[in-house]
């Protein structure tokens, strides 16, 4: 499949969160081992007007990648045991990122099962911490480009509008009202909390709040 170029990531965060659905995330390790998965759930985070965003209070050493060029990875550690993978969005200097919340495993499944300690394919990547573990991604890829050779996205058919669900984001305590979670309603691989329903019509424009 064709790799997605830099122009794909040069989109407003809310738009990118939806455009990422259905795309193929590829992880290539130094050993040559390749794992692939289809993105089926995302969440958008904006540095401006979004108190749930790590960059809401400005740049720190931890969140500096969010202010960098789009199409790079912002990876952070949470709950004392999980890494979370985000794709940086917005123009350089403006904080924004899309959390990869769930994926459908496609290739290298045996390796994913070994890492996760489960044979259940539905449970392999049905959460942000799970998918990072399945792909073998940690802090060593913080700030890395999706135009490189360690990770990249491949193009795939766009998900039909009627199969895209929208809901508030999960597991946050601030800005909980913002409907910035996107997911493929027909996928059995989304996280266990299925909120919201398929959207019936496209908004005129996806804008920041």
Swiss-Prot record:
It holds the Pfam family Pur_DNA_glyco. The keyword Signal does not apply. Its EC number is 3.2.2.-. Keywords: DNA damage, DNA repair, Hydrolase. Residues 197-209 have a biased composition (Basic residues). Residues 189-209 are annotated as: Disordered. GO terms for molecular function: alkylbase DNA N-glycosylase activity; DNA binding. It is an enzyme of class 3 (hydrolase). InterPro entries: Formyl_transferase-like_C_sf, MPG, MPG_sf. The keyword Lipid biosynthesis does not apply. Coiled coil: none annotated. One of its GO terms (biological process) is base-excision repair. Belongs to the DNA glycosylase MPG family. NCBIfam families: 3mg (TIGR00567), PRK00802.1-3 (NF002003). This is Putative 3-methyladenine DNA glycosylase. It comes from Chlorobaculum parvum (strain DSM 263 / NCIMB 8327) (Chlorobium vibrioforme subsp. thiosulfatophilum).
